[in-house]
Amino acid sequence: MATRNALRIVSRRFSSGKVLSEEERAAENVFIKKMEQEKLQKLARQGPGEQAAGSASEAKVAGATASASAESGPKVSEDKNRNYAVVAGVVAIVGSIGWYLKAGGKKQPEVQE
């Protein structure tokens, strides 16, 4: 039943571009809160050791809903590879912008025979 409601809401929202009525918005909010509550209860039933070994999606939901807790630390990535990828991306973007700006002033004369 819940999946049918979720499918109906998603299909209505994305198919016609129609703005949801107040009833539909309220039903969607209730559904979302219920799903979040169920996930929190599921995490609470698991032990603290099992919670750390849980899936990444559960951890994201727990982190998103418990963002006000004192347990959450600074949001700094500790993954070396990801940090290197971010730095490489920034360097590539800055380099491409510099290359574009440097080449923008040069106009090659057309050779006509």
Curated annotation (Swiss-Prot):
Residues 41-79 are annotated as: Disordered. GO terms for biological process: photorespiration. Keywords: Mitochondrion, Transit peptide. Residues 1-14 form a transit peptide. One of its GO terms (cellular component) is nucleolus. InterPro entries: At2g27730-like. It is found in: Mitochondrion. One of its GO terms (molecular function) is copper ion binding. Residues 55-73 have a biased composition (Low complexity). This is Uncharacterized protein At2g27730, mitochondrial. It comes from Arabidopsis thaliana (Mouse-ear cress).
